[in-house]
Structures are given as C-alpha cells and as structure tokens.
C-alpha cells in the first residue's frame, strides 16, 4: 500500500518512507527563511539529517559566521542561488556563488556563513550525523501555512541578518553552534568566486584531498563515473570516505537513463541507511513490501539499513541527490562497477 509509505512529516522512528516536496516536514520559519526536515535524527537512527531551506533574496547574511565541532554540513543548490563562505583555520578564506546543481562542502571546525541571492532559492542541507534539526526547532517558529508555499511571502526589511543575533548565537553551543563573530566575509567575488586564482564554472573541480578542508563542486565540473550494468547511471561524488573520515558517509548525485527491456532492475540492500531526493525527472522506488511509488522533483525516499529496495527512472533522464551512511553504499557500488566518465550525459546507444 503506497499510502502508508508516504508521510507528511518525517517519522519519529526508523522506517521506510517517502515524503513529498514541500510537505509540512515539521517546517519552521527563521525570519524570512523556511526550513523543512525531510530526514531527521529520529527518522534515520541519527545517521543524517536532510533538510530543505527556501528563502527570498536578502541583502544580509543568512546566519552569522560559526563552526560546528561535531557535524559535517553539505550545501546543495536546488534552484536560485546563494553565496557560501568557508574558511578552515588559518587557510585562505574561500567563497563561491552557488546556482542550480552546485555543491559546497563544510567539514567540522570550518567557519562558514551564507547569503541568499535569488528570489526563488532552495538549498538542500545534508548534515552528518543526524539530529542537527533540533537547533532549528529551538530557534524557529512553527510554520502554519495551509498551501505548502515554498516560503511565506514577507514585506519585511531584507537588510538585517537573518537568524539569531550575536548575543543569541553565542549561547547555542549545546546545539553544536560556535559563533565566529570576528570572521569577515570577503567581498571581492568576481564571476562567482574568490580568491582570484580559483576555478568556478570554467573548469574541473576536485574533492578535497586533505580531510577537513572546505571545497566546492560546480554543477557537472566534478569527477564522474559511468555505470552501464543496469542501463546507464552517472555518479558524481561530492563526499567519499576520504573526505568523510569518521563521519562515515558518502554523498553524490546519480543521473540515470531508463532501463532497457533486456535488463532486470536489481534489488539492493546495504547495512547503512540511505536517502535520495529527486532533482530532475521521475524516479520509481519500491522499498521492502511497500508498493512501488513514483517520485518527482524534490521528493525524498528514505531507506533504512538492511531493507531491500529497487529504483528506476521513469523519465528518459532523471537525477537524484543521494546520501548513504557508511562508505560502501549504492553510489560507491556503482562507482566500483563503472568507469571514469567525462560527460554529464550517458551514451547515445545501449
């Protein structure tokens, strides 16, 4: 029965589920920003949190600069654009303007902040381990909209910093937020990037070779692998075991073709929990004994560790953002069974 698989809010215990884009998802507002929590600590066994942030343009920072000592934070731009700043220790401060499909990696103890640029912006945050949503429950106001609007329109002044003020943010250490109020975001961005010697939307981006360093991958400009075992799937890793270290997870996008009639859709099962959010196309997922369910843009499927699942693309081209607990999940299996690939599109023939 599909109806029992689909939920309006992430469950308070670990079970398979699908949650639609812009579901209530225990939404809260923090000033003009609206946060939804599609996967939470309790729903994932504290493996990871997957949250959506929708917000309008702002002339000010979305949050004051801070670090996390225990949580590895990932920023993915679904649509619109936002600027992300990150600095590790005494290293050079980095900043990029992220647009659709771009990714920013903020490991533990990296000072960071962001600013929403476009009126129709959505960020997906993947935070490891799970449970970081408790901060937003504490800071935010429960959203009570009945239309599932991406964010609640406001005529408020967009020039003041969103989120907790300097005195409040300094009291949030129990939520793993450590204010870095002396951090000054650099303002010398040219063509979406600073410092000047950095590559952004003009050439290849690599994942960090040194664990703990922040890094950025522009849409389509990172490493890619083509798996041809079950139709075509292109895995673009964002976080591997090298970067995750003891946080023990992987993060990728997976772009997929339809499944040829000669191929049987495989059944998968992994020790760690995993989830994916559809970014483009239509993806059918069948989890455990639940009926097959079609997911559209923004929809999220969560699969607990040890539960069998199948998935395939109903559209000619679909793309998902995929997170897995552990270092040997679906994305890594597809990479291991594939080959390095230079294109974002799959071959023209089977």
From Swiss-Prot:
Entry superkingdom: Eukaryota
Sugar-modified residues: 90, 109, 142, 191, 248
Residue ranges, annotated region (Cupin 2): 206-350
EC assignment: 1.13.11.24
UniProt-listed InterPro entries: Flavonoid_dioxygenase-like, RmlC-like_jellyroll, RmlC_Cupin_sf
Region (Disordered): 148-167
GO molecular function annotations of the record: metal ion binding; quercetin 2,3-dioxygenase activity
Biased composition (Low complexity): 152-167
PTM entry text: The N-linked glycan at Asn-191 consists of Man(5)-GlcNAc(2).
Activity control mechanisms: Inhibited by diethyldithiocarbamate and kojic acid.
Residues engaged in binding substrate: 66, 73
Pathway recorded for this protein: Flavonoid metabolism; quercetin degradation
Cofactor binding remark: Binds 1 copper ion per subunit.
Its job: Performs the first step in the degradation of the flavonoid quercetin by a dioxygenase reaction. The enzyme catalyzes the cleavage of the O-heteroaromatic ring of the flavonol quercetin yielding the depside 2-protocatechuoyl-phloroglucinol carboxylic acid and carbon monoxide. This involves the remarkable dioxygenolytic cleavage of two carbon-carbon bonds.
PANTHER family: LIGAND BINDING DOMAIN PROTEIN, PUTATIVE (AFU_ORTHOLOGUE AFUA_6G14370)-RELATED (PTHR43346), QUERCETIN 2,3-DIOXYGENASE-RELATED (PTHR43346:SF1)
Quaternary structure and interacting proteins, as annotated: Homodimer.
Designated name of the protein: Quercetin 2,3-dioxygenase
The organism of origin for this protein: Aspergillus japonicus
Lineage, uppermost ranks: Eukaryota, Fungi, Dikarya, Ascomycota, Pezizomycotina
